[in-house]
Every structure is written in structure tokens, then in C-alpha cells.
Amino acid sequence: MAGNDCGALLDEELSSFFLNYLSDTQGGDSGEEQLCADLPELDLSQLDASDFDSATCFGELQWCPETSETEPSQYSPDDSELFQIDSENEALLAALTKTLDDIPEDDVGLAAFPELDEGDTPSCTPASPAPLSAPPSPTLERLLSPASDVDELSLLQKLLLATSSPTASSDALKDGATWSQTSLSSRSQRPCVKVDGTQDKKTPTLRAQSRPCTELHKHLTSVLPCPRVKACSPTPHPSPRLLSKEEEEEVGEDCPSPWPTPASPQDSLAQDTASPDSAQPPEEDVRAMVQLIRYMHTYCLPQRKLPQRAPEPIPQACSSLSRQVQPRSRHPPKAFWTEFSILRELLAQDILCDVSKPYRLAIPVYASLTPQSRPRPPKDSQASPAHSAMAEEVRITASPKSTGPRPSLRPLRLEVKRDVNKPTRQKREEDEEEEEEEEEEEEEKEEEEEEWGRKRPGRGLPWTKLGRKMDSSVCPVRRSRRLNPELGPWLTFTDEPLGALPSMCLDTETHNLEEDLGSLTDSSQGRQLPQGSQIPALESPCESGCGDTDEDPSCPQPTSRDSSRCLMLALSQSDSLGKKSFEESLTVELCGTAGLTPPTTPPYKPMEEDPFKPDTKLSPGQDTAPSLPSPEALPLTATPGASHKLPKRHPERSELLSHLQHATTQPVSQAGQKRPFSCSFGDHDYCQVLRPEAALQRKVLRSWEPIGVHLEDLAQQGAPLPTETKAPRREANQNCDPTHKDSMQLRDHEIRASLTKHFGLLETALEGEDLASCKSPEYDTVFEDSSSSSGESSFLLEEEEEEEEGGEEDDEGEDSGVSPPCSDHCPYQSPPSKASRQLCSRSRSSSGSSSCSSWSPATRKNFRRESRGPCSDGTPSVRHARKRREKAIGEGRVVYIRNLSSDMSSRELKKRFEVFGEIVECQVLTRSKRGQKHGFITFRCSEHAALSVRNGATLRKRNEPSFHLSYGGLRHFRWPRYTDYDPTSEESLPSSGKSKYEAMDFDSLLKEAQQSLH
């Protein structure tokens, strides 16, 4: 109830207030002053009788009651399609068009705008229509509008207030009644407010255009006769809908204000009505209406649809040249850098570098992106105001230019140019000259690079087959050539000056090796290095880690021996640093190794602790061996400017050369078949185990002499030397058969033929054995060839065991084709494992390492048990073989076969038992005391072994004794420990070998313990 009473009371008070106001408006200024004094916070100058009613008085100021439900806050004044002509405005425009058609064109001239004669410069209307919504104070209107005694409403106000009845408005316009100056003073802002309010409230929807609006558009776009009027109020448009595409694009966007207006509404209307000489009020109304329409439809235009500026230099705020240029020239770098994108320019070029890792370059590409002014001599070139903005040009080129799929040899070059206040013609001439010079320089560099790629000697790497295929100018921080074989040699980047241009340019130095290797042609160096300081780039990791310093002759050599091969990175390109080389620890930290697999050899390890350092000490004269005609062994001669320290050879090559000097009979073609292993563990050397065809052949032909064994080793073991070798032999070797050499070499072909016939191809026969050796968890020697540890070949053990037995063993050896040809008179050929084991334990880099363990570990053990050789059981290969055998026994894959016939060979036994599954190892051993034979068969799968144990007895022939099969191991060679498992008691040693407590049972041990306590 209280709320309703208050609402009713408020309605009554407001109604009485508005009635008093409407009655006092006829009284002139006194009534208005009284109302303003009573309610100073309300601006009543915009109120009218048609605007009020008790229901909607709390709403906003309205033009028409129908538009009160639309909220103006939902529209943004910046919307380009905000101001549209709706149905009500179409009615207004129809009335105005009908009125304007009757007006002769002579009346619409300079006389219609008297304020222009006085030289007034109207100010630009703000971009947003919101400030125009604010009503001016009554005091300001009082100053602008003098008082008048006329009481009737003006013709323009009647027309605008009666928008719903266009016919009545047109009739009222023809009457030409006089209007009150006081009423005009209190409502001079009203047309602007009505336009603003309506435009804010209407939905920006496109509607069909009516014909009267088209006629009004024709009239309003007619060319005015006076140029000053044309310049002051440019050709307006009634609606954004009537603009074409071309006009939308040609709108002047550089004017800070969205449109020019002849004058603000209050000024124009007040000054039109302020002249006391106006004798024809209808004519003044027409002028004011024309001015209002021009203002309204220019005000409705968005910023991009404004008409173009007039070319005449009228002192206007919008068309002023200084105002046009000022927004552009105020912050030119900001506009420039918003358009310039580093990543876009980098991706546009075909650059073989990772731009996200600038630390991998000698000079990061981002260091050149700072715009630098060109240091040209200042010339008297006063630029006009139109050319006051400085033009900047950023060129990103790769030197030389990429002319196809061939990658560029030089890294990115960024050239930032800035032309400051140059005349157009002079600037063009200078640019053309500079472009010609740059093109000539780039052509020269390209020719030099092609010559550099052609004349650089091949290094045996894949990319040297194509002379110009230099893959990259980025050197990741690695230390091994084996891990990065595709990386090229050192690339030295220099800071190349191009005339007076200080922009950075990374360039590779070229060198010529035509006449003499290592000699540097002074022409290319003198042409490239007179001014720029050499900046040593990252040293190629394949050179630094492996010790092969086939250095680029143009690379500067530091005087210090310690830092001669360290990684060097230029921290700055300033002249103060010059050619200073930095410490290794600092530069590696700066380079970083992000994204790389952590190597076992740390990159920060000093060069003196080279993990690839060979054990064999070589003199400098031994670096060039005549037996290895490879380009890799050709060192570059030291240049006068470089250090006189001889380049350090690759350790693996050096070790290989040392072996080749002793074993000169090794064909050169086999030297590169298998990579010699390093003595120590290096960068992922276990990934580099190669298996060429020669290695597979050596694996099968284990009884043959090792390929790369030293002469002294061959002499120690009494092995026959090849024909080319004239070294003396031991006396023990003189009793051998004279046809020993020929039979060895001839038997090679026989062995290969027989093995291929029986086992098939070499790869398939050896595949299973290799997999078995690699799957073992005890496979702790990663460099060791699987053939070294899997020397338990089936066709060697039996013949080695039967050497002492005489003719039967010799015949059986001939049957197998691999038995040593020496008879009983010839001292037995000790297993080549003694000498070759020493070689293997010293260094596994010998190419004959696969034949080090060519004799079975079990056979070695048998020899050791019977004191037939001084071979040691502690070599890694023997321990490894024992572990593998124990693992196979534990998995149940070893089958022990007893009671074999005397003529049974390992080949025959394996052939019979292959029906159960794949056999990894087959041995036939002879008991020396009794002459009985037994065998061991190791299957790959335990299921196959179990099947052979169950059904293996059925494989015997009629004249053969029955087989006794069981799971077993090498128990018969371990009598002290396995006496209880032996089939016969006489084979066991006397039981006295046992201790006292081992022979006692538990009760006896308990009694003995109790007695000892007392």
C-alpha cells in the first residue's frame, strides 16, 4: 500500500510540475529560469509536451512513444551498420523530399550558410555519437539564442515532432508560420538529440529502400556551386545502404574524426535564427532544414564510409595535411614491426637450420633482426610533409640464393635497411646500385662455394659422392663421427662486410686444394677476410670426438695446444673480442646438448682424456701407411698461419694401420668390411656392430687362420704363414707335412661347399646362434662378436678330442673336413686361442677377433684338465661361454646322449636330432680312458629338448647300440663334484677326497656336534 501511495503521489506531483512548466513556457525567460532554479539537476531544455505522459515519464527522452521499448545500450556506436533509416524516418525523408523538390537550386547556395562568410571553422564531431546525447546547459543556450516574443512552434519542430503524420507535416511546412525565439532557444539541441536517440534505439537491419529516399539522395548528392561550401561540407550520403563498394573502400580513414560537419546543430540553428535581418522565415527554415539533413546523414555514416576529402587545402581539422600525416609518422616502427614477422620470413626461406635452437649456430639468426640505420653520409634532402615517414625495408636472404632443391651452404643473412629522407630518384639510383653489387657478390660466393664443394677431397663419407651436397651449416654438439656420419667438415663463419652495410652476414670461407693438399690459396682468403673478424664456428663433432682434425685451412688455429680442438663459439660480434677463442668448458655450456641422446662420453670431458685413444703408440711417420690408399689417411699439410702440430689420426684407423703394417698380406678390400672395435667403451659403440659377408665367412671357417693376427702371434702358435710372408718359423713347425699350406688353402673351398650343402646358406645357419648369444642376460661384452662366444661349433670339438687317438680320429677329421692336418708326429696345434686370446684381451679391434674363440670352451676345458695346453680359463670369452652353457642347462635345453657308436660324428648326430627342432650346439666327445663316445645337443627351445629325450632313442640304426638320453651338462668332466651322478664308480675319484663331515649323515653330525660342545 505504501508503494502504491508513493507512486500515485509522485505521479500527481510530476503531472502538476509538467503542467506548470508547459504553462510557463509562454512567459519567456523568467519561467525557464524559475524552473531551472527549482530543479537545477534537471535539464529541461529538451522537454516537450508530446514527450510526457504519466506512464513513461521515468524512461529516457523519447522522440516517439513507439520506440521506448528498445534499449539504446544494446548497440555500439562503432557498429558500421548501426544507423539505418527505418519506417518512421522514411516518412520524415519523404516529407523533406517533397518539400525540397519545390525549392529552386539557386536558394541552396552560400547564402544558406551565413556562418561560412564570417570565416568560422567548424570543429569535427566526435567519432562516437554519445557526446552529442549530452544536453547543453541552459546558460549556454541562452548565450547562443537571443530571446524572442514569438510563441508558436517553428516549422522545423512541428515537422520533426509529427513524424507519424507526414501529410500534416508537409502542410505545416507550406504555411510558413513564424516561430518563437524563446522556444527555439530552449529546444535548439532537440533535432540532434532526436536523431541520436532514434539511431541508438533502432535495430540495424537492412530494409528495402523506397523511392523518395532515392530522390532525396539525388538532391543531396548534387554538386554545390560554391567550392568553399563543397570543401566545408562534403557530399553526404543519406544512408550506408546507398553506398557502393567502391565508395566504401575509398572512404578517408586517415581522418581522426569520422565525418566533417558544417556546424554543430545548436550553433547552426542559433546563428541562422540570430540574424535580425531575416525577413523570410520560411526560407530560413528551408536553409536550416537542408543543413540539418546534411548533418544528419553525414553523422549516420560510419568511419569507413565517409566521403573522400576535397583536394583543396582548406584549413579544416579533418582535411589538414598535417593532421593526416601525423598519425602515421608518430610511431612508424610500431606499425612496421606489427607487419613484419620473424617466423614468417624464416619459414619463407629454404634454410636448413632449426630456428628454435639458435644456440646451435655460430651466430644466431635473431641477432640480426634489430633494425639498424644505414650509415650513409647525410645529404641535403628535405622531405616534403607527405614523405616525412621513414621507409624501412627488411630483407632476409640466404647467401647464396637457393636456386633449386640444393640447400644453401651459408646460414641466414638478415639485412635491415632504412632510408631516411631521401629523394625518390636518388633513393632509387642508390638502391639499384646496391642491388647490383649484392647480386655480383652473391654470384661470386656461389661460384666459390661450388668450387669448394668440387675440390674438397672425399672423406669416404656418403655425402662426398656429390660434390655440392653439404647438408647443413648447423653443428650439433656431438663427439663421434660414427654417430653423425652425415655431418660435414668444419664450417667457419665470418662477419662479412658488404660495403657500408653493417648488417650481419654469416659466410663460409672457401679454400682450394687443387695443387697440394693443405695449401691454401691466398686469393679467396684475401678477398674474404680483410675487414671482418673471423668467428670460429662450432667444431664439427665428428672431428673433435674422434681425433681426426682434417681442418679447414681457413679456420684460425689458436696458439694454445690445450684449446686447439675445443668447441668455440663467438659470444659477440664486436671488434673488441676479435679472434679470441674461449675456454672449452664455457663454450660447451653455451652450446648446450638439448634434444640429444646423453652420450657415455660426456661432451665436457677434456680432449686429453680421449676415450678413443689407441693403446698402440704410433709415431707420426706411421700415420701414412702405403697399404691403405684411402683419402682418410691423407693428412693435410700444416699452413704457415696454422699451428704446426700434426693432425691427430683417427684412433681406430691408427690401430687398424698398426695391424696392417704387421699383417701385410691382408687384402685391402677386407680392411673396411668389419669396423675394428675400440679398446674401450665409447659413444654407443654397441650400436655399431657390423656384420659384413666376410665376418660371416670367418664365423663358419673358424679352423682357418685368423685374418688380422700379428706376425709374432702367428709364429708363437706355429701356424702356417701365407706364401707372401717370409718370416721364420719355429722349430716345432718343421716336422709338419710340407703340403700343409696347400691343403689348408684348398680345404677352404671344400669346407665352404660341404657346409653350404649340409647347413644351407650362411645367414640362415648362423642366425639362430647369433640370436641365442644376444638374448642371454649375461651378454656383458657388447663389442664381442657372437661368433667369439659361440665357438662351440659342432664340427670342431670331436676332431680336437680325437687327435690323440690316431688314425681313426684322422679319418673322422677328414670326414668332417676341418680337422688340423698335422699327424701325431707333429706337435698338436695348440688352440689358436692362446695368442689370439692375448690379442683379444689387449684389443678387440683386430679384424680377427671373431676367430679368437674358434675352439670350444668345453674343449679348452678338456685340454686344461688333461694338461695338454697352458691355456687359461679366465678369459672373458670362456667365462661367457660357460655362463651361456649353464643357462642352457638350467632351462632344460641341453640333452646328454651316452652310448654312441664309435663312428658317430657330430655332424651325423646333429643331422639325426634336427627332426625334433632347431639345434644351437652339437658336440661329440670321446672318453680318453675307455674310448666311448657321448654327445651334447643344445636345442633352442626346451620343448624340443624334451621331445628329443622322449623319442631320441628311436633314431639309432640297427647295428648301433641304444642311445641313453637324459637332461645333462658337463658332469663327466667334473669328477670331484659329480661322482654320485656318474654311471660307473671306477670313473670317480677315491672318496678320501671328501672331508670327514661330508661322509657323515645327519645323526652322526648331530652326535659329533654334541660331543664337541662338552
Swiss-Prot record:
Motif annotated as LXXLL motif 1, chain positions: 140-144
Residue spans of biased composition, Low complexity class: 624-640, 784-796, 836-856
Superkingdom to which the source organism belongs: Eukaryota
GO cellular component terms, semicolon-separated: cytosol; mediator complex; nucleoplasm; nucleus
InterPro entries per UniProt: Nucleotide-bd_a/b_plait_sf, PGC-1, PPARGC1B_RRM, RBD_domain_sf, RRM_dom
Keyword Phosphoprotein among UniProt keywords: yes
GO terms, biological process: estrogen receptor signaling pathway; positive regulation of cold-induced thermogenesis; positive regulation of osteoclast differentiation; positive regulation of transcription by RNA polymerase II; regulation of DNA-templated transcription
Major location category of this protein: nucleus
PTM-bearing positions, type Phosphoserine: 145, 148, 384, 519, 630
Pfam families, per database record: RRM_1
Extent of Acidic residues compositional bias: 430-451, 797-815
Keyword Ligase assigned: no
Biased segments, Basic and acidic residues type: 412-429, 606-616, 726-745
Protein localization: Nucleus
PROSITE patterns in the cross-refs: RRM
Stretches for region Disordered: 113-138, 165-212, 227-283, 307-331, 369-477, 516-563, 592-653, 715-745, 780-886
Biased composition (Polar residues): 178-189, 264-278, 317-327, 520-534
Keywords: Activator, Nucleus, Phosphoprotein, Repeat, RNA-binding, Transcription, Transcription regulation
Motif (HCFC1-binding-motif (HBM)): 683-686
Span of the annotated motif LXXLL motif 3: 343-347
Oligomer and partners: Interacts with estrogen receptor alpha/ESR1. Interacts with hepatocyte nuclear factor 4-alpha/HNF4A, Sterol regulatory binding transcription factor 1/SREBF1, PPAR-alpha/PPARA, thyroid hormone receptor beta/THRB and host cell factor/HCFC1. Interacts with estrogen-related receptor gamma/ESRRG and alpha/ESRRA. Interacts with PRDM16.
Domain notes: Contains 3 Leu-Xaa-Xaa-Leu-Leu (LXXLL) motif, which are usually required for the association with nuclear receptors.
Function: Plays a role of stimulator of transcription factors and nuclear receptors activities. Activates transcriptional activity of estrogen receptor alpha, nuclear respiratory factor 1 (NRF1) and glucocorticoid receptor in the presence of glucocorticoids. May play a role in constitutive non-adrenergic-mediated mitochondrial biogenesis as suggested by increased basal oxygen consumption and mitochondrial number when overexpressed. May be part of the pathways regulating the elevation of gluconeogenesis, beta-oxidation of fatty acids and ketogenesis during fasting.
Note: Transgenic mice overexpressing PPARGC1B exhibits increased expression of medium-chain acyl CoA dehydrogenase. They are hyperphagic but lean, with increased energy expenditure and resistance to obesity.
Protein name (database record): Peroxisome proliferator-activated receptor gamma coactivator 1-beta
Organism: Mus musculus
Gene: Ppargc1b
